[in-house]
Amino acid sequence: MKRRIFTYALTLFALSASAYDITDLKDLPDHPEKGKWVQCIKVEAPRIHADLTTATPLSFQAKGMSRILVRCGKHILTPEGVNLDSEGRGRVTLNPKKLPAGPINIQIIADNAKKECDIYELQLWNAATKTARTEKGMPKDCPAVAKGMKLDFYDDFDRGLSISKDGRGARWNAHKPTFGDFSGWPFCDPSDDTDGPFVLRDGYLVIQARKKPGTRGSTGLLAPVDMDGKGYWVTPPFYMECRFMAQSAPGTWPAFWTITNIHRGPGDELDIIEAYGGWGEKNPNNTGYFTTTHYWEQKDENGKQLPGDDKLIKTDKDDTSWSQDFHTYGVYVDKDSTVYYRDGLPVHIIATNAMSFENKHVFLINYAIGGASGWQIDLERYGNRSNMYVDYVRVFTQH
């Protein structure tokens, strides 16, 4: 896990305040790459991580902006635009009956003629409806890629959470075994605090990143192996997947990944998804996510460090990103190929390294905030609060 340095075109879904046809998101204009990102959007209500129980006004200010789009996943909430007053204040009614149940992310996207732009992601919980979210919960069927395999491990977070500070006596370890925690806001032990790193709600594991005044902050990591190396390891061939959603904001760094070695020395690391949040100067400005393969401390035939593999998986305009909605991220490993998946479809394939096939893997799920990524942390306008919502994780194997 380390910082990725990259520059990509910045994609902004920006709409004028007048009426328009939004039947196809591909028709929405791209924002110029050299747009100036500014933090101008302020949400006045509802509060961050609030429950929606009835129709609720979304009140915000986007001073200096002229074009606004408000969306929830693929749902466009402002089909007739947003009228802003002279101070840039706007108001949109959030109707929970028209939104998915459970965790949702409301995106407010703004720009102006000066090419200034901003994106604000408001995480809420729709508690007013039982409207099914597509594919919510762990499917009963085996995914096509795992046909012929058996379900070897799963957690759908419907049965309580068994986790301890070192993994001993529990299903989950709250730290990376056996060394190497890497988050700027530290991965912390489980606690009964309502703002602690782990909370279960309605079949979701909520990993809560928080920074209270006077603290270094806190966030969460899960690994099914304890500090003695005991627990769940999977032997190739295997397929594993995890379904989650997080927030894109400066410093957020959700990931689902595997390692073959929990001690120092040679080992492979498969980053099934490594996502970097945040827009603007000194931020990733990334509309996709990475699949990354590391071959730690391994030499090629010339005695040089064996190069890894790094692939940006871009999010199309007519799709949703890792912060806009839930998606399932997976990896299949056999002797010949390592194939990365998103929502059951292959997105990247490489030849399997010998160490990946000949060794067992342990997987990790985490919501890092800054740290080894190298990206700045700036969650002040979110009250230094951000959540990652994990629906389930499961592993299939031939053994």
How should these model regions be labeled?
Residues 20-51:
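Short, compositionally biased P/S/T/A/G/V-rich stretches that sit at domain boundaries
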Residues 116-127:
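Edge beta-strands of extracellular beta-sandwich domains
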Residues 84-93:
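Aromatic sugar-binding surface patches on proteins
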Residues 94-103:
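Surface-exposed, short loops/turns at beta-strand junctions within beta-sandwich domains
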Residues 96, 129-399:
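GH16 jelly-roll
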Residues 108-110:
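Conserved structural position at the C-terminal beta-strand
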Residues 61-67, 333-335:
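Short proline/glycine-enriched turn/loop motifs at strand-loop junctions of beta-rich domains
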Residues 50-52, 56-62:
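Aromatic/hydrophobic beta-strand junction motif of beta-rich domains
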